[in-house]
């Protein structure tokens, strides 16, 4: 499922997930007191709204307008302000040094990695969690290998940063999670 209509169909009528990612909650003490956050492939906006509730100015981007509508409704109910952007994540141009926090959950597109690296400010935090190829050993979840992380892929892409947390697991599902801080520029 990669085009907007497929994702719109998936979100249409589906119950919204409102709880933020456990990874974000676990490491919420690392968030800056203020700043800008980008939530890549934000889906129904649960993490965008959570970050806004932590005092960050948030941009949530997703290809599905149905998902973004769920996010708008969740933000409205919780009194949060989020800038919602519908866009093709495989063609998006991210501003350089624009964000203090970037999150990417359940989305893999390796050609986006250089843009994520450039868009995050020095000292900024990256939260990344998605399925690995080990997921193919389980009956549910994504089946397209192109959407699944290779072993240690996140470490290869961001391992030169300060890795604060990394995990690859295959209990109940094949997942990898990374929390990393972009090194501060040395003057």
Regions found by a protein language model. Give the residues of each.
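A short, conserved alpha-helix within the catalytic core of class I
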Residues: 108-120
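Conserved SAM-binding strand-loop segment of SAM-dependent methyltransferases
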Residues: 78-89
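Conserved class I S-adenosyl-L-methionine
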Residues: 1-32, 34-43
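Conserved SAM/SAH-binding beta-strand->alpha-helix loop
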Residues: 64-66
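Conserved beta-strand signature within the Rossmann-like core of class I S-adenosyl-L-methionine
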Residues: 124-131
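A short acidic, Gly/Pro-enriched loop at the edge of an enzyme's catalytic core
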Residues: 94-101
């Amino acid at each position: 499922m990669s085009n907007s209509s497929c994702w719109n169909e998936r979100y249409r009528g589906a119950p919204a997930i409102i709880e933020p990612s456990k990874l974000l909650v676990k490491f919420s003490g690392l968030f800056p007191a203020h700043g800008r956050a980008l939530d890549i492939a934000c889906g129904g906006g649960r993490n965008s709204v959570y970050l806004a509730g932590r005092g960050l100015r948030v941009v949530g981007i997703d290809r599905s307008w149905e998902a973004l509508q769920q996010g708008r409704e969740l933000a409205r109910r919780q009194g949060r302000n989020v800038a919602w952007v519908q866009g093709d994540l495989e063609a998006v141009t991210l501003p350089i040094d624009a964000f203090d926090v970037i999150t990417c959950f359940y989305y893999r597109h390796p050609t986006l990695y250089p843009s994520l690296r450039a868009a995050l400010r020095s000292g900024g935090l990256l939260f990344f969690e998605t399925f690995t190829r080990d997921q193919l050993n389980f009956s549910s979840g994504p089946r397209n290998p192109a959407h699944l992380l290779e072993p240690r892929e996140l470490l290869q892409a961001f391992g030169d940063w300060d890795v604060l947390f990394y995990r690859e697991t295959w209990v109940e599902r094949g997942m990898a999670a990374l929390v990393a801080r972009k090194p501060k520029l040395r003057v």
